[in-house]
Amino acid sequence: MSALDRLTTLDTSFLWLERPDAPVHVGAVAVFEGAPLLDERGEPRLDELRARVLARLDRLPRLRRRLARVPLDLDRPVWVDDPDFDIADHVRAVRVPAPGDDEQLRRLAERLHSESLPRARPLWDLHVVTGLAGD
């Protein structure tokens, strides 16, 4: 990457359109077989998952970068390395409310996606959802 890794024009427009009550970001929901991610109590192996994600971040260095605004906003923001990067801020567990059906998962996804990502850190999150019916 170049010395100045500038945000694209499209991403910058999303950034400026965003409001606290209306975040403008992309999200996805994927359902996987839970057993490999769970310990004997049925809880997510977060430390192991965080270690696996962290070990692969060198392939996607932007996931360790946060935005920095240009003085007076005279140009698009740039991506800068986050010296305070903590994988625990990005990979978390959350339990879907009972009964753990598709509707509850949809509501949880809506709630998580409606929250703004903190701009002081890299702009991504990974939520491991437990409590789905059939887990």
Could you describe each region identified by the protein language model?
Residues 1-135:
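Non-catalytic N-terminal regions of enzymes
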